[in-house]
């Protein structure tokens, strides 16, 4: 029985490359000369540092631009609050969202059931397994999910479809 998994993952290597490029651009730009603007990264979050809120917004724009060029979906970033750190400096923590949260997984299952397609969807941890009788039906399900969930810019999520098996 053919099946595939719906997941929401971020390619950490591409994120690291985009952050390196953004840091290089921030360090060489004239308007950041003498400032402490930088970007730090650990596995689950990205931290932006700058002297002023305006500079922080510019660093964020550079980061978003570099992530987009490396084809990392910026909807996977969860923006935290602006925090003041020592002196007049500011920072912002961006959490990297990975995996489907339970609300989105339930929404995907409900959407597939309401569509009257001949597929079964089951939640398996942070992924949704979709199985059906024919490959064509599964491809229609992928098209439906791309149209309804992945294209929703406001509260959509970056979806990937992997483990497609016959």
Swiss-Prot record:
Keywords linked to the UniProt accession: Nucleotide-binding
SUPFAM superfamilies tied to this protein: YajQ-like
PANTHER family linked: UPF0234 PROTEIN YAJQ
Protein name: Nucleotide-binding protein CV_2047
GO cellular component: cytosol
Alphabetized CDD domains for the sequence: YajQ_like
Lineage: superkingdom: Bacteria
Origin organism lineage: Bacteria, Pseudomonadati, Pseudomonadota, Betaproteobacteria, Neisseriales
GO MF assignments: nucleotide binding
Protein role: Nucleotide-binding protein.
Family: Belongs to the YajQ family.
Gene3D superfamilies on file: 3.30.70.860, YajQ-like, domain 2
